[in-house]
Design a protein with these regions (language model features):
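C-terminal active-site subregion of NodB/CE4 polysaccharide deacetylases
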Residues: 1-99, 106, 137, 141-154, ...
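Extended, charge-rich helix/loop segments that form flexible
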Residues: 26-33, 37, 135-226
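Short, well-structured alpha-helical interface segments that form or flank functional binding sites
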Residues: 64, 106, 110, 215-218
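Append "and occasionally in soluble cytosolic enzymes with long acidic Gly/Pro-rich linkers
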Residues: 75, 219-222, 231-232
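Glycine-rich, histidine-containing beta strand-loop boundary motifs that form or position
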Residues: 80, 124-128
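CE4/NodB-like, metal-dependent polysaccharide N-deacetylase domain
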Residues: 91-92, 104, 109, 113-125, ...
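A short acidic, amphipathic alpha-helical/loop segment
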Residues: 110-114, 219, 284-288
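Short beta-alpha junction loops
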Residues: 128-131, 302-303
Length: 352
């Protein structure tokens, strides 16, 4: 089902490009700017089974987007400047802002060099447990479990279930099912228990995943001294906030900020909701982020930035630079607002 959805999106992007419809829709739906979502930036990996491919783009694709923005005379700005322009209604020039979620080491090793070429700022949203080396990027651990197994046994809703993982196709099917099940568990402790058991059964060192992929506090301290780099908060544990109590959500927000500020000795005023879609961030989370004192908070709901977003600063949409669609032809489609307009039923604001 997810592969079908991916194919449909790809076909839609190509259709917008080939028909030129994005040129017609740009004046209406491009808005005043775009906040881009990224996770990993690194060279392309080999292997047929890559269920998290959508979370990584190559340095060349990032460079292509930056070239497109510069040639289109679109300003590339920081989250601080996004906030200023929206609140002061300084919107005469279109802008783009680059945000990177989780705090992966490749943001420093690959993305920063590309951003420097264009003197382009970036904001990295850090999950504080990831920087501590105690976090659980469980979707990566799940990929590792399935990659090495010919079958996976798990108890889902009290029913013992055996999933075939002997081929790349069956691995993808199993990953999709287990990913959705794990993300939907009602509390983070349940997810921790289940992914921990899977990793133990299949000899995957879950604790090492975070340390191998994410920047430590010491690395972040050096990274954050780069003039182009901004740091935001991304919760403590990277849990699905919508599944937690008000008290837990507030603690995830404020404690993550406090830890980052203490470790890096700099203020943190921007937040990114873990997962960030409708199933993970809604009106309650938007209100709690505002109450916690964040100037802005970003979702992963697809959308361009319009002047009206100034009234919803803790519910800002983003546009994903998705590893499944690394085709330079679609870059003007992404910045035209045509794709997100169609996705949103031609609504400009989605903050409910």
């Amino acid at each position: 089902m997810k592969q079908l959805r991916s194919n449909v999106i790809r076909a839609g992007l190509e259709a917008l490009y080939l028909t030129g419809a994005h040129h017609l829709l740009r004046p209406i739906f491009a808005g005043v700017g775009t906040i881009f979502t990224l996770h990993h930036v690194r060279p392309k990996r080999s292997g047929e089974f890559q269920p998290n491919r959508h979370l990584e783009v190559t340095p060349d694709f990032l460079r292509a987007m930056l070239l497109h923005l510069r040639s289109s005379q679109i300003d590339i700005i920081s989250m601080d400047e996004v906030h200023r322009r929206l609140t002061e209604r300084s919107l005469s020039r279109r802008f783009a802002c680059f945000t990177f979620d989780d705090g992966y080491r490749d943001n420093r090793d690959y993305a920063l060099a590309v951003m420097r070429e264009f003197d382009a700022p970036l904001t990295v949203f850090v999950a504080s447990d990831f920087a501590q080396g105690t976090g659980r990027p469980w979707w990566i651990a799940l990929e590792m479990v399935i990659a090495k197994a010919s079958s996976v046994e798990v108890e889902i809703d009290g029913v013992a279930t055996r999933l075939d993982t002997s081929t790349a196709a069956s691995k993808q099917t199993a990953f999709d099912r287990l990913h959705d099940w794990l993300r939907g568990l009602p509390e983070r402790q349940n997810l921790k228990r289940e992914i921990g058991a899977l990793c133990a059964r299949h000899a995957v060192d879950e604790a090492a995943v975070c340390r191998e992929l994410c920047m430590s506090w010491e690395e972040l301290a050096l990274f954050s001294q780069e003039p182009l780099v901004g740091i935001g908060a991304h919760s403590v544990t990277h849990c699905n906030l919508a599944n937690e109590s008000d008290e837990v959500v507030s603690r995830e927000m404020t404690m993550s900020r406090a830890r980052i500020e203490s470790a890096l000795q700099r203020g943190v005023v921007h937040f990114a909701y873990p997962y960030g879609d409708r199933g993970a961030a809604g009106r309650r989370e938007f209100a709690l982020a505002k109450a916690a004192g964040f100037k802005t908070a970003v979702t992963t709901r697809p959308g361009m930035i319009f002047p009206e977003n100034a009234g919803h600063l803790t519910a800002l949409p983003r546009v994903s630079l998705n590893g499944n669609y690394q085709d330079e032809r679609i870059l003007p489609v992404l910045t035209s607002g045509a794709a997100t307009a169609m996705w949103n039923g031609f609504r400009r604001i989605d903050a409910a």
